[in-house]
Amino acid sequence: MSAKFDISFANSASLENALAIVLQASGEAQAVAGASEADPGGVIERASKISGFSAKSMATLDVIAPQGSSADRLLVIGLGKPSKLVAHDWLRAGGTAAAHFKKADKVVIYLDAPGVEVSAEAAADFALGLLLRAYSFDAYKTKKKSDDEKTPKKVDVTIVTAAHKDAEKASAVSEAIAGGVILARDLVNLPPNVLGPVEFAEKAEELRKLGVDVEILGEKELKKLGMNALLGVAQGSARPPRLAVMQWNGGSKKDEPIAFVGKGVVFDTGGISLKPGLGMEDMKGDMGGAAAVTGLMHVLAARKAKANVIGVIGLVENMPDGNAQRPGDIVTSMSGQTIEIINTDAEGRLVLADALWYTKDRFNPKFMINLATLTGAITVALGNLQAGLFSNDDELATRLAEAGEATAEKLWRMPLGKDYDKIIDSKFADMKNSSGRLAGSVTAAQFLKRFVGETPWAHLDIAGTAMGSPLTEINQSWGSGYGVRLLNELVRAHYED
């Protein structure tokens, strides 16, 4: 059960029966925001000396409010050195605060730490951190944890800051971003018997209420388009495939659209090339790329982004049955290129091959970025701390990397090249869908590159970051929602009117 926060901004607030949270930068001689109101007895200074608290980044000090304060509890959050503060630290501080709400139903947060410049954007980022940390997924638990049962469904949160008027306006964007990230997390966390291709497409259709144009292509339309690579993956499942096309037209009519394409394998058994049983339950998250694209479209529409954006997601289930695709099959993709199937567990690239070609052919976008939980090889290379970035365009790659640094959804650029491309040549078709273990993430990217033509393109392999990544101040969920904030920042920084 996710906590519900009613967040407001003000220049002062009543502390009666509240949890009071104050922020402190290191090296500020124990000065804290809101000290005169929340801590008239100076208990924070005394407790800091006794405990050795020095306001290091995201360190906390939790004390009972002193006599003379109308608050119930005091929490100090360290910000570290002011010179080292970056935008993402405000999200982390918000998440740290939310983790300490416990049973409080009223919280007052003094944001203006001495020695720290707090902008409206910083205050809004703090609020975003609160919202993201509040998320939890326990919809299918009939008995909640005892702490959760006692947690109030609604917490009144007042953020006290001199920038309160502008922060209130800026927080609307924070709410939009939180909504998109939470949508992506929900999609990844949902069980596969609940979220099939049809049900996922219905989730995409719900974006219409935000003004997104949504078109759903069924099996008949996909066959007519010649999407045999995508259809080949789906043919072993009793659940029919879908292609969801989402359009947000917030920019000028003359502006070229930008496009995001997501892999949406709602469950991946590996097909005939069956995966080991141990850990297969995690393959409900093999649609993390499609979840991120859907979450991004939510954000852009909710905040009324001034850009024309296309989101395309290929939705299939990869199952073994008597009609399933076989190793040795050859399929003709929408592009006309032929593909020899070597491994049916290299299915995501087949879905993306047709989805990318369709997007390029129909919309002629300024660029295309695809997201996919594509290869286990990328987790060997980068673990679950960064996603792999492959691109045929240096400017796009640089902008993506910068957005990754700004949002802490980090990317590491990986190589592409003719020598790698040769590895996926087939004896019997134009290419093969798998070339073995060596350079697995690179050859997968080379495969995708054959379906983008001259369009500037980037491929983000998010196999290590979309699910099961390390828990942070702003994410305590198995499904992380990775990519939503990253791509929203890319659009905001470079592609809005």
Curated annotation (Swiss-Prot):
Any GO MF annotation of the entry: metalloaminopeptidase activity
Pfam family, one: Peptidase_M17
One GO cellular component, as annotated: cytoplasm
S-S bonds: none
Active-site residues, as the UniProt record annotates them: K275, R349
Function: Presumably involved in the processing and regular turnover of intracellular proteins. Catalyzes the removal of unsubstituted N-terminal amino acids from various peptides.
Name of the featured protein: Probable cytosol aminopeptidase
